[in-house]
């Protein structure tokens, strides 16, 4: 494994960080999960993708959803983990707060 080099510059900020364009009535929504079972974890990721969410971490997605779509998603995700232990967080975020978004990344030397 290569040497970890901490990048000092800000990698992505605010709305420019993700190519997301919301429509009327839609709110940025984070989905994060912690699920032990690989099959169920993959199913949860697939459901998030089906709802047009973009993966931002191994177990995290973001995208614009209406209130109804968020509720539908919540039901599907709840049902998906019903036979396993796990935890799912669905968090709407207003644009004003999302503009405060900051992301820093450490990379291995030579991966830039």
Task: List the predicted regions and their residue ranges.
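Basic nucleic-acid-binding interfaces
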Residues: 1-30, 35-112
């Amino acid at each position: 494994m290569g040497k970890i080099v901490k990048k000092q510059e800000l990698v992505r900020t605010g709305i420019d960080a993700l190519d997301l364009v919301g429509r009327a009535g839609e709110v940025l929504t984070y989905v994060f999960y912690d699920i032990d079972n690989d099959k169920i974890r993959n199913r949860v990721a697939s459901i998030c993708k089906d709802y047009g969410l973009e993966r931002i971490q191994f177990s995290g997605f973001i995208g614009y959803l209406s209130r109804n779509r968020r509720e539908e998603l919540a039901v599907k995700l709840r049902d998906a983990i019903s036979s396993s232990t796990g935890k799912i967080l669905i968090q709407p975020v207003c644009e004003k707060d999302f503009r405060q978004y900051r992301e820093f990344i450490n990379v291995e030397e030579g991966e830039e």
